Amino acid sequence: DDSRLLLWGNANFADIGMDKELYDGHVVDAALTDTAYIVLLDDGSVAYSGDKATSLLATDIPAGAKSGVVSIAATANSVAALKNDGTVLTWGVTTRGEGAIPQFSAKPIKIEGGRYHYTAVLEDGNASSWGHNRYKQINVPAELTNDSVDVKNIFTGYYQNYAIDANGKMHTWGLKGFLLGTDDLGRDIFARLVNGGKMTMTI
């Protein structure tokens, strides 16, 4: 309720320093990449809240992200801001298609980020995904793009998406799982073992 952001965990390889005097009491939301994060402030602006001033997330913040932002999201190496007019801005490392924003059927009202992709719920109840598609995580089911289903909310995992419709039904697309499951970073255990990786498993 006091608009503060609290962080904990191992910060050895992450930039999670924060200028408390600048942002405390004004944080509405936060979006985390693999090693850093941005915050949405109560004035509708986006700020890079780490302490590495040379980070692309800090130096490449678009001018349009300084006001009117209503939703933020992040992938492993990029971040996105959704403005109140439906404009989506992305910056950071977008080499996997994260910056290839599609033509929407209506104004986006919420955005979520996976490992290398983004998904948005639109004002007309449809959904849209873009970015990396190795596991078909941007192949939105037809019923979520042709006005057949009224999507009310979305959530993303590393390589999958979950949409909740007006009737409370969940729709999913993307990675359906690996033969031997995943490790704690979402990687294919079977592929790791085949390629000489080692790990302990309980069967």
Regions found by a protein language model. Name each.
Residues 6-24, 47-65, 89-105, 131-147, ...:
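Short glycine/serine- and acidic-residue-enriched loop/turn motifs that recur at repeat junctions
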Residues 166-179, 189:
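N-terminal, non-cleaved signal-anchor transmembrane helix
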Residues 3, 34-35, 44, 76-77, ...:
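Short coil/turn segments that connect the beta-strands within blades of beta-propeller domains
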Residues 189-203:
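Transmembrane alpha-helix signature in integral membrane proteins
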Residues 25-34, 68-76, 107-115, 150-153, ...:
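Repeated scaffold domains used in trafficking and secretory/extracellular systems
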Residues 7, 36-39, 48, 78-81, ...:
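Conserved core positions of repeat-based scaffolds
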Residues 1-2, 42-43, 84-85, 124, ...:
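Acidic/polar residues in short coil/turn loops that connect beta-strands
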